[in-house]
């Protein structure tokens, strides 16, 4: 039986990506789309690429009848999601794409987001949505917290290595480049074409990026002790994609073997042959993450490079992957499309 889906906050980039993916899903149909500031408008007037997808018009959240909805995706901003989800029917399955439920400890949320959580009980119940590592818990979850796109990329590259003790836990560096869609659709001066094109810049320097909270939480959990990484994100003038280059101390061949073993049988994680490096071009529009390992012959370090699409595997695609599990569907349903090249 086809599952009925609501998307809350459908007028943002991740909401539109959910529409694109679910429009081609064999077992899901969208019955409600919300966008309070654009209520009453057809989705195709907001995103013309969705014309012909047969989507309902945008409405306000309070106008949605959730009685027949099997699962809701919440693509609202952080701090808004928690209050909205708290008010939803208690038996409604929810995949949240915001940052509101990623950190298990309310004190960690307050530290990184500058305010107390409005739904701490739900925060503690939420399952972290890094599918390949929380698959069993996600199947039985009522609320799944989508990962940060940067945090997901770094974890796919490093988590199996930390868990298996093949890298120095006290010397991990992540340099990451993200496309501009990662900053959202809101009008911001620094994202104007003339401000961003023909250049790139680092941001959230000095250990201030909020996704560090996810790295701290997840890496420390699998290591069994405190692990803190050095993380520097960069914003680049392309639309989609994340490329993370991770520098670690460890034997590169052993690192490659560990990643190959960890992801054997995983449909959406592809470990490239030793010495090869991935490109964001190859994963654009897909739910795949490509990982390469290279030995640095001068420093003795290993370089692990991971590429994914921040809107798909880094957010909406992974959200659909989690929803498939929560609804008892084939995990890969609606997600097997290849990228567009060139």
Curated annotation (Swiss-Prot):
The pathway where this protein functions is:
Amino-acid biosynthesis; L-arginine biosynthesis; N(2)-acetyl-L-ornithine from L-glutamate: step 3/4
> Per UniProt, what is one GO molecular function of this protein?
N-acetyl-gamma-glutamyl-phosphate reductase activity
Just give the chief location class. Answer: cytoplasm
> Which family, according to the similarity comment?
Belongs to the NAGSA dehydrogenase family. Type 1 subfamily.
Protein name listed in UniProt = N-acetyl-gamma-glutamyl-phosphate reductase
- A biological-process GO annotation: L-arginine biosynthetic process
An example GO CC term for this entry is: cytoplasm
Protein encoded by which gene: argC
> By its UniProt entry, which SMART domains does this protein fall under?
Semialdhyde_dh
